């Protein structure tokens, strides 16, 4: 078994323990069996199915900060840090269950969205709340005695609210029914991706590992924030680029940003340089559900040289981030390797 697969298996084993713990808490409340089974089914359906990047990076970051590798952590230590990883995966599950209902999505991670599973429907709203609630039940059980317990709570509450702000701006900017490209701007795009993605996917995993490692100086949290937030923005810009220019075989999904009227980086770059005629073509075709309109937009993006603009942006942001990482002050226990590892996962990825 490869190291990567072994790390994933060990992480998944902890999830089984957590489901059992949550189940026992419901048993202690004298919850009827059918409700316990429902919650367990929701946990298993919605939480462990993705790539688990966010959760695993808490473990990897903790290991780097403690001069070791994740496979060398003893079981007690491993379970505790993996629990923080699973808390992010529960947060992600909570967002996705709700997000899929808001977007009326059909599938998620290769299976029907939870609200479309037979018999679930609007109960999925309450299920999403329970996935979030599970985070705090688990944190209380495992971290109540730790000096950084309140820091963990603050961090989860703040990042959750930031993500919801990003989601709000996304929803009111990109209405699937009414296409209005005047609503789009690169400033809005930047706010959406930083708040909706960068905080919980990039900053949160590292900040959690730092608190657990006793690295809690605001100077250090700021050092990582100043790198991970732009890195998260770059990650999402890359995602927008791949949605339009990547092939389904390459990215593992069919890009839908154009048809969904998304306020993506690609359309915003096009709007900056389009002639009035080209703008008219975008007004007439962007956000339309048919393949022909989508293709017209894609052809125009190619014609406008968006690919080169992206590659130039990528090289400049990566050079800037590398320089920032080089200048990190490691005197209080922070390690450059943490940030180098994150950058390595994002730079030149193809899916």
Swiss-Prot record:
Positions with a binding annotation for Mg(2+) 2: 99, 103
Reactions this protein catalyses: isopentenyl diphosphate + dimethylallyl diphosphate = (2E)-geranyl diphosphate + diphosphate; isopentenyl diphosphate + (2E)-geranyl diphosphate = (2E,6E)-farnesyl diphosphate + diphosphate
Residues binding isopentenyl diphosphate, per UniProt: 51, 54, 92, 109
UniProt pathway: Isoprenoid biosynthesis; farnesyl diphosphate biosynthesis; farnesyl diphosphate from geranyl diphosphate and isopentenyl diphosphate: step 1/1; Isoprenoid biosynthesis; geranyl diphosphate biosynthesis; geranyl diphosphate from dimethylallyl diphosphate and isopentenyl diphosphate: step 1/1
Cofactor: Mg(2+)
Domain of life of the organism encoding this protein: Eukaryota
UniProt GO cellular component terms: cytoplasm; fungal biofilm matrix
Binding-site positions, dimethylallyl diphosphate: 108, 196-197, 236, 253, 262
PROSITE patterns: POLYPRENYL_SYNTHASE_1 (PS00723), POLYPRENYL_SYNTHASE_2 (PS00444)
CC cofactor note: Binds 2 Mg(2+) ions per subunit.
Binding locations of Mg(2+) 1: 99, 103
Enzyme class, spelled out: transferase
Gene Ontology terms, MF aspect: (2E,6E)-farnesyl diphosphate synthase activity; dimethylallyltranstransferase activity; geranylgeranyl diphosphate synthase activity; metal ion binding
This protein's UniProt keywords: Lipid biosynthesis, Lipid metabolism, Magnesium, Metal-binding, Steroid biosynthesis, Transferase
Stimuli inducing this protein: Expression is increased in the presence of fluconazole and decreased in the presence of lovastatin.
Gene Ontology biological process terms in this record: ergosterol biosynthetic process; farnesyl diphosphate biosynthetic process; geranyl diphosphate biosynthetic process; isoprenoid biosynthetic process
EC number assigned by the record: 2.5.1.10, 2.5.1.1
Protein family per UniProt: Belongs to the FPP/GGPP synthase family.
Record's function text: Farnesyl pyrophosphate synthase; part of the second module of ergosterol biosynthesis pathway that includes the middle steps of the pathway. ERG20 catalyzes the sequential condensation of isopentenyl pyrophosphate with dimethylallyl pyrophosphate, and then with the resultant geranylpyrophosphate to the ultimate product farnesyl pyrophosphate. The second module is carried out in the vacuole and involves the formation of farnesyl diphosphate, which is also an important intermediate in the biosynthesis of ubiquinone, dolichol, heme and prenylated proteins.
Protein name listed in UniProt: Farnesyl pyrophosphate synthase
Species the sequence originates in: Candida albicans (strain SC5314 / ATCC MYA-2876) (Yeast)
Lineage, uppermost ranks: Eukaryota, Fungi, Dikarya, Ascomycota, Saccharomycotina
């Amino acid at each position: 078994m490869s190291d990567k697969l072994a790390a994933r298996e060990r992480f998944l084993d902890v999830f089984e323990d957590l489901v059992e713990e949550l189940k026992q808490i419901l048993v202690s409340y004298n919850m009827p069996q059918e409700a316990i089974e429902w919650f367990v089914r929701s946990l298993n359906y919605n939480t462990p199915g993705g790539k688990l990047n966010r959760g695993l990076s808490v473990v990897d970051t903790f290991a780097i900060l403690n001069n070791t590798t994740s496979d060398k952590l003893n079981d007690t230590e491993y379970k505790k840090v993996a629990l923080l990883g699973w808390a992010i995966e529960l947060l992600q599950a909570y967002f996705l269950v709700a997000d899929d209902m808001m977007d009326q999505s059909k599938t998620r991670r290769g299976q029907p969205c939870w609200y479309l599973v037979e018999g679930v429907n609007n109960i999925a709203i309450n299920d999403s709340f329970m996935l979030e609630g599970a985070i705090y039940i688990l944190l209380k059980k495992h971290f109540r005695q730790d000096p950084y317990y309140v820091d963990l709570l603050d961090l989860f509450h703040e990042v959750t609210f930031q993500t919801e702000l990003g989601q709000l701006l996304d929803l009111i900017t990109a209405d699937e029914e009414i296409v209005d490209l005047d609503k789009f701007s690169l400033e809005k795009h930047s706010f959406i991706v930083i708040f909706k993605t960068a905080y919980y996917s990039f900053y949160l995993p590292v900040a959690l590992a730092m608190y657990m490692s006793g690295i809690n100086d605001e100077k250090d949290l700021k050092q990582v924030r100043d790198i991970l937030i732009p890195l998260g923005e770059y990650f999402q810009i890359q995602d927008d680029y791949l949605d339009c220019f990547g092939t389904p075989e390459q990215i593992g999904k069919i890009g839908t940003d154009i048809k969904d009227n998304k306020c993506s980086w690609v359309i915003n770059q096009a709007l900056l340089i389009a002639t009035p005629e080209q703008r008219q073509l975008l007004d007439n075709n962007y956000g339309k559900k048919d393949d022909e309109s989508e293709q017209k937009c894609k052809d125009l993006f190619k014609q406008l040289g968006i690919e080169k603009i992206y590659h130039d942006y990528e090289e400049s942001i990566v050079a800037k981030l590398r320089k920032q990482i080089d200048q990190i002050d490691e005197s209080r226990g922070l390690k450059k390797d943490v940030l180098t590892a994150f950058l390595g996962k994002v730079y030149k990825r193809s899916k």
